[in-house]
UniProtKB/Swiss-Prot annotation:
Similarity section: Belongs to the universal ribosomal protein uL14 family.
InterPro entries, per database record: Ribosomal_uL14, Ribosomal_uL14_bac-type, Ribosomal_uL14_CS, Ribosomal_uL14_sf
PANTHER family: 50S/60S RIBOSOMAL PROTEIN L14/L23, LARGE RIBOSOMAL SUBUNIT PROTEIN UL14M
Domain of life assignment: Bacteria
Record-given protein name: Large ribosomal subunit protein uL14
CDD domains membership: Ribosomal_uL14 (cd00337)
GO (cellular component) term, any one: cytosolic large ribosomal subunit
SMART domains from the UniProt entry: Ribosomal_L14
GO molecular function: large ribosomal subunit rRNA binding; structural constituent of ribosome
Amino acid sequence: MIQTETRLKVADNSGAREILTIKVLGGSGRKFANIGDIIVASVKQATPGGAVKKGDVVKAVIVRTKTGARRADGSYIKFDENAAVIIREDKNPRGTRIFGPVARELRDGGFMKIVSLAPEVL
């Protein structure tokens, strides 16, 4: 579960390395986000020459969480880190590459471009 002030690694080549959650989108007073949810975040670490700079406010979708997610068949999927991918308004990623595996739940949220760019879908 991702909440306000949570720091996440960025799993794309948009130029950001780490982001800090400002707000979880979707509903009034929503506290937590899980895999496939959209957040508003601030870039805390960035690589030089990237598309996004330190201090930029961006939207991102969560692709990996340590807490994990329960699937319809009763199984759980968990990862070793919390990670997100920075997206545009049309739900397409800002970067051109995705690093590391992503969860299958992104397919249900309409993030097909992220799923197709990912090296592995679990």
